[in-house]
Amino acid sequence: MHPFASYVLRSYYKATGWNEDNLYANLTRSSNAILDFTVPRGLHLTVSKSPNALFKTTYSMTAMPSLHGSVGYIFTSCDLDVKSSGNVRFKNMIERFKVYDQPRRPEPKEEEWLAGEQVQKRDYLLYGRFYLPTGRLDALYSTRLSPTVQALVAAISDPPSNIPSELRDRNGDPSNIMLNLQHDVGKWCTEYTWSAEDGMWGVRVLHNFGRLGMSDAVEDGGGGKGDRTVKVKRVDEEDAVEGGLKGRVSMGAELYFSAKERSAGVSTGIRFTTLPDATPPSFQVPSSSSSSSNPVSPSTSQPPTTITALFNPMLGHMSGAYTARVSRDLALSSRFDFNVYSYESEWTMGAEWWLRRSLTPRPSEDGEIHPPTPPPFPPPVEDVQGVVKARASTNNDVSLMWEGRLRNMLVSLGVVSDFSSRSKPIKAIGLEVSYFSSE
């Protein structure tokens, strides 16, 4: 489940028109959602509030195994349509398998005029979080320098403390500041990174083959207007060929080095993904005359599929993953990792199963069972009420997690087990409850 701060950050990217998916760091995002999901540890509670469209607050507390908490504040320069935990789209709060929309060049903001003069307004986001009792402080500043360039500054301040080590965050990082510059033109996306702690410089590049998408591309699961999709040939669409999968290919690489640590690293990756969740191919879109008599479902052409491969020549690590949605509510993923130097390997399998409300007919007053009458318009409330994720690997690690909505709260419950240990088969179990309001 996404933390409230991550949900606000994604809403900020969406409001400013920035495509966070067109990054080399997110090349394996679809398979990671199923194979690398994070199971909560202990008891974790989060309460957040949006007093207005620009300012947000969030409070979190972990009661088990140790007691600690944090306070966070978020401020944005633009209005964000942040929902409450009771009415937010459930899939927007879950890291899930998804065929992401085709990349496109970011568009500039609309011009604003005041008293006959153009107002130069730059979007930005400020985020800060203070942890208790460790005294650690996290900060993030994100701003758009131009329609295609975004800058991020992240800082961590972790002062020395006399607090016992068991009360401190296990993943705590020393004080550091990192600069990140992203340049996205749709077909290419480049990242430049600098870290002050170890003096590390890095660059990442992602190239998308084929033509760019349209600016009015339809989101996953969303419906666009008919006049925008009927008889429109998608720009990256190829001619119909029997057999095989149709989609797009993306390739990328990263290079980083540190003069202070006298170390360097390099990796490369490739991704193939189909496009059934975006604008359907033109031959699958029914015309205005035949749409009512012979509708065609775009999802029946090919299953949503993502295939990725990564290679790190310096560490000798190779990884290949295959992820596909085999039905409306079930997605499966498999990944094989291999090291060419040590010959160590690992095979990981995972599944994602969505739970929906049952629409069973109810008996009427006369005792007869009548089928439910479909409403004249689609209901505004989605029928998804939860998701179950499972993961197993050849290292005998098995993880199971359920995420759902109970009344106005988002709940995550998970367990991690190790079948190779008879003395302690359950490694971790946790419960996370999140509530946030925008009223």
Swiss-Prot record:
Location(s) in or outside the cell: Mitochondrion outer membrane
Stretches of Low complexity bias are at 280-305
> Per its UniProt record, what InterPro entries does this chain match?
Mdm10
Question: Where do the record's region annotations for Disordered lie?
Answer: 275-305
Give the primary localization class.
Answer: mitochondrion
Q: How does it assemble?
A: Component of the ER-mitochondria encounter structure (ERMES) or MDM complex, composed of MMM1, MDM10, MDM12 and MDM34. Associates with the mitochondrial outer membrane sorting assembly machinery SAM(core) complex.
Name the family the entry cites.
Belongs to the MDM10 family.
Designated name of the protein: Mitochondrial distribution and morphology protein 10
UniProt source species:
Laccaria bicolor (strain S238N-H82 / ATCC MYA-4686) (Bicoloured deceiver)
